[in-house]
Structure formats: C-alpha cells, structure tokens
Design a protein with these regions (language model features):
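Alpha-helical transmembrane segments of multi-pass inner-membrane proteins
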Residues: 38, 115, 119-124, 143-247
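Hydrophobic, aromatic-rich transmembrane alpha-helices
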Residues: 35-46, 83-97, 195-206, 349-369
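N-terminal signal-anchor transmembrane segment
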Residues: 2-94, 120-124, 179-186, 384
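Long extracytoplasmic/lumenal interhelical loops at the membrane interface
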Residues: 277, 281-299, 303-307, 311-347, ...
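Aromatic-anchored transmembrane helix interface
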Residues: 75-87, 106-121, 131-151
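A membrane-periplasm/extracellular boundary helix in multi-pass inner-membrane enzymes
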Residues: 219, 223-229, 245-286, 302-307, ...
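Hydrophobic transmembrane alpha-helices and their immediate junctions
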Residues: 210, 346-384, 418
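Transmembrane alpha-helices of multi-pass inner-membrane enzymes
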Residues: 377-388, 393-437
C-alpha cells in the first residue's frame, strides 16, 4: 500500500523526531547515545522499511566495530539495536495501516519451530544449571537465523523494495570496501561476498553502461573476497560460483565469465596500491594456517553431543577446565568455532534438523531455476552451509536466515526481467515531498 506523505506531515514528524532525539541524548553516558541513534533509525525505517536490513548489516558492522573496542557483546548490541529500531518502525506502520501484511513462504513454519525450540532449550538450559549469560549467548546464535528471515519477509514485501534494498546494500558495501580495501590485516569478506553472485546474475542480463558498472562492482567485490584471508569465506564463494556454473543457464555463465575478466582487471589496478599488496601477501598465510585449538575444541563439543544426542545439553552448556593448546585451562562452550558442533552440543539432532529444514527447503526452490535471480541466493546458501562446518561467526550465521528469505521472496518474481525491476524503481510516482512509502 502506497500512502502519500504531504509536506506538513513530514515537517511535523521531523520536528517531533528531532525533539525526541534531543531529549534522549540527555540520558547519561552511552545509554543516551544509543537511545538517540535508535530513535533516529526508527524514524528513517518508518519511511523506508526496506532499509532495515542494509543499514542493520553494514551499518551494524561498521558502527559496531568502531564502538565496541573489540568486545563482541558491544558489536552484537549495535546490530540488535538497529534491528529493534526496524521492528518498532514496522509495528508503527502496521498500527497506522500503511504496511501491507507479509505473505507466507514455505519456510515460515520451519523458522517458527526453530524459535520455539530456542525458547524451550533456553528454559531447559537454565533448569539444568547452565549460567544465564551463557544461555543468552547460545540463544542469540540460534535465534539469529529466524530473526533475519522474518525481518526480510516482513520488510521486503514487494519487488520494488527488494530492488531498493539491494541497491542500498551494494552502495553501502561499495563505500565501506573502498575505504577499507587497502587496510592491511582486515579480514572478513562476508559483506562483499553476499553481493557477488546477484551482481553476476545481473551482469548476464544487462547491457551497455549498466552492465559495465555492475561488472566493475562485481569484480571489485570479488577481489575483496579473495583478499579476505578467511578460508570459510573462500569455501562459500567457491561452492556458490561452482553451483552457478553447473546449474546456471547461458546468461548466468556469461555473467560469470565477464565478472572473472573484470576481477582480473580490477586486481591489476588495485595491485598498484601498497596496502593491497600487503594484504595479498596474507593469502598464502591463510591457506597454510593450521586449525590450532579448534580441533580439540570441537572434540569437546562432540563429546557433549555423544552424551545427549537427541536434544543436546541445553542452551548455554559449557565444559569447564579443558586444556587447549595456547589457552592452558579454559571453559569450552557454549559456542564453538564449528557451527554444527555448537548446534549439536546445545540442542542436539532435533535442533540440527530444525535449523536445516527451512534452509534446505528454500535451496530446493532456488536450484530449480537456471536463469532466475533465485539461483544466486540458493547457491550462496549452499556455500555458507558448507562453510559452517568449520566456521561460526561471533555475530551468528545471520546469512543463513537472510538468504532463504531472499530465495523464496524472489521465487515469486521468476522470469521478470531485471530491467522491469529497475524501471519500476526509477519511474515510481513521487509525491510533493519526494517520499513514497
């Protein structure tokens, strides 16, 4: 539903928002700053709900890294604040009846079951004596997947919103990567990898300067993924591209070949920068790096799973006094460096099935298309499922919630040319304030 926002409404709303931000900044310490940021973001998301995920993912990563000082809890808190602001904005839009109801997807039931299991497993973990803080940490790891799934299905409800969110994501990711690509020691690549397969798909369909621009971005992001020096990201990227090569049609393969050529050209230009050369020297180190203590850590988690294979030891389980090379004696759990070990130790086989069920269902839908936009999202899902064997990001596998949602949401638009998407965005009606909701 599109509702015109007239100028007086915008002026009054902006004045009220400014007054509220001014008031909350008077709160003591970082609480006031966080409250002001939350209110401001809520106002933005109230007008543009499709911006919740791009801002939450990239803005959360950048702002969280700046403010957390290396503390994972602070990093996660920033991301959760942005998502919470989006949730409040969405609730207000529904209350004002300017938001259309979200459609149902085949994965909704599976994601709801995962939320229910997380609640039950948290209660069970507290009942058996697991520490409340550890229960909260483990619950976050599990709940991240369905939370991002439902945020996507409730904010990206139209083709126009999906495209607008994608454009904003690529712009923010491009700015962030351009500023950081020459910084030695920067690892990651997740943000840029999320954009590469969809850009490859677009490059196979567009023509002229639009295609050249998309190829430039895709090649630039691909180089950043290569410089990430993170084997989990490399595995996810390699498997996703392989699936697109094998399953994709002519247009997809054309996009792959053109992106590969663009990546080589971009790499040649970036190699002139000393910072990029320093980062490229870390690639060999990333390949040769040993698993270190992670193997011993995973064996502890698998031992916990072997004792209680069906439902695990409850969220927040931890094994105290374990010797790990380089750490002497330490507590192991509830989060391990292998995501599946985390799942098996905390919620057992039942939890693993509930985690995989909705994701694999979306993959089945996405891989059924040879030239549709669902293919790159499904291919990325497969890549990250494989990488999760030995990778567990501290902020959770949010991509395993977002990608299935994008796969199922775009499946409804199968066969619609990208140019029609772009035309709908560029030629949408503009009201007196220039704002459309």
């Amino acid at each position: 539903m599109r509702v015109p926002i007239v100028a007086p409404t915008v002026l009054l709303g902006g004045a009220g928002l400014g007054a509220l931000v001014t008031v909350v900044t008077l709160l003591p310490g970082p609480v006031g700053l966080a409250a002001a940021a939350g209110v401001l973001c809520c106002g933005v998301f109230l007008l543009w709900p499709w911006a919740v995920l791009p801002v939450g993912i990239i803005g959360g990563a950048v702002i969280g890294a700046m403010l957390s000082g290396g503390d994972v809890r602070g990093f996660i808190a920033v991301k959760m604040l942005l998502l919470a602001a989006g949730g409040v904005a969405l609730a207000v839009r529904h209350w004002l009846r300017v938001e259309r109801p979200a459609g149902r997807t085949p994965a909704d039931v599976g994601m709801l079951c995962l939320i229910g299991l997380t609640v039950v497993a948290a209660i069970y973990g507290l009942a058996v004596g697991n520490q409340a803080e550890e229960v909260l940490v483990a619950a976050y790891q599990m709940a991240t997947i369905p939370v991002y799934f439902f945020v996507a299905t409730h904010t990206l409800t139209t083709t126009r919103r999906i495209l607008a969110a994608g454009v904003l994501y690529v712009v923010l990711a491009g700015v962030f990567t351009a500023l950081a690509v020459t910084t030695p020691g920067r690892h990651g690549g997740l943000i840029t990898l999320m954009a590469v397969p969809p850009l490859i798909w677009a490059a196979g369909r567009l023509r002229g300067w639009r295609r050249n621009g998309v190829l430039l971005l895709a090649g630039f992001f691909a180089v950043d993924v290569l410089l990430a020096s993170y084997r989990g990201i490399w595995l996810a990227a390699a498997l996703a591209l392989l699936i697109m090569l094998v399953r994709g049609g002519r247009a997809v393969r054309t996009g792959l070949a053109a992106t590969a050529a663009a990546g080589v050209a971009v790499a040649a230009v970036l190699a002139l920068q000393p910072g990029v050369r320093d980062r490229s020297g870390e690639i060999a180190k990333g390949l040769a790096q040993s698993a270190g203590y992670r193997g011993a850590e995973s064996s502890v988690g698998l031992g916990v799973f072997a004792d209680q294979p069906l439902v695990g030891a409850g969220l927040g389980q931890s094994t105290p006094g374990v010797y790990l090379s380089g750490f002497t004696l330490t507590d192991v759990g509830p989060v391990y460096h292998a995501f599946y070990v985390t799942v098996l130790a905390n919620i057992g086989l039942v939890g693993l099935l509930l985690v995989l069920w909705p994701i694999l269902r979306s993959v089945r839908v996405g891989l059924g298309s040879r030239n549709g936009i669902t293919l790159p999202f499904a291919a990325l899902s497969c890549g990250f499922l494989a990488a999760a064997v030995f990778a567990a990001p501290t902020d959770g596998h949010w991509e395993l919630g977002l990608l299935p949602a994008l796969t199922l949401l775009t499946a409804e638009q199968e066969g619609a040319p990208l140019r029609r998407f772009a035309g709908a965005l560029l030629h949408r009606p503009v009201h007196r304030t220039g704002v459309t909701v």
